[in-house]
């Protein structure tokens, strides 16, 4: 029994490491807006799915079919392969350089929670029905191999919650902006140079006004809502909002949020 629990825990550890990359790619691709994540996945099948964990999965399946003393040996071998593969993935994540690393926002933390619940289900079921050990180990291993698709499933499962959270913070931001009657909003958009233009304009305006630009390269509706709700104060006179146009209708949506007077 201890061997099977260890097997589930090793698989879960592998999931936690592999998910760092898959969640990062989901975030980088705007949580699959306009199917960006699925398109990325289609063009990166090798990096997403071709790992040694497939070999471990095959060994788990054979162990379940044999169901004899050789099964234990195969499970040990599969665990060694899994641990090796996981450490390789862990190292590759450490040395990879990205312009934008994974930001563990509240949304990402909710996704991690859902992901962990899904991947711990086989272990939970095993505690109630140990006779299903081989089937459940194979299911857990399949979920590991298909981690990038499981992360997409997590995104789908969390969609109702994310819609509720989005509208809550949208209403909070619009209410706050409406209360700041002395605030003028300047919108900045374009294909290139938005952040630089925003920073230059802020340097000029801050000489005579209390101006507040969106931080770094925050230019989505979510980023703007965060800035309004957390950073703007009643003393600010000018809000410089950087607005990104990632799809048709995006600028209109952001304008409906902040209602820029100039831009």
Question: What annotation goes with each model-predicted range?
Answer:
Residues 3-103, 110-263:
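Phosphate-binding loop of NTP-binding sites
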């Amino acid at each position: 029994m201890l061997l099977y629990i260890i097997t589930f825990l090793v698989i879960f550890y592998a999931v936690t490491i592999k998910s760092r990359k898959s969640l990062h790619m989901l975030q980088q691709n705007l949580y699959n807006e306009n199917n960006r994540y699925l398109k990325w996945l289609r063009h990166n099948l090798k990096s997403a799915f071709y790992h040694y964990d497939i070999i471990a999965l095959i060994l788990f399946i054979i162990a379940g079919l044999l169901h004899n003393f050789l099964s234990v040996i195969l499970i040990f071998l599969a665990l060694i392969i899994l641990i090796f593969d996981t450490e390789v993935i862990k190292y590759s994540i450490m040395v990879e350089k990205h312009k934008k690393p994974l930001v563990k926002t509240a949304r990402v933390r909710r996704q991690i929670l859902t992901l962990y619940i899904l991947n711990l289900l086989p272990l939970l079921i095993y505690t109630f029905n140990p006779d299903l050990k081989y089937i459940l180990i194979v299911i857990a291993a399949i979920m590991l191999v298909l981690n990038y698709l499981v992360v997409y499933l997590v995104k789908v499962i969390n969609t109702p919650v994310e819609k509720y959270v989005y509208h809550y913070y949208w209403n909070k931001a619009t209410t706050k902006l409406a209360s700041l009657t002395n605030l003028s909003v300047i919108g900045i958009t374009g294909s290139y140079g938005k952040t630089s233009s925003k920073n230059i304009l802020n340097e000029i305006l801050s000489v005579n006004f209390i101006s507040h630009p969106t931080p770094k390269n925050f230019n989505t509706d979510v980023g703007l809502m965060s800035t309004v709700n957390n950073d703007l104060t009643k003393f600010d006179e000018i809000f410089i909002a950087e607005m990104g146009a990632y799809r048709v209708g995006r600028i209109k949506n952001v304008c409906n949020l902040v209602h820029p007077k100039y831009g």
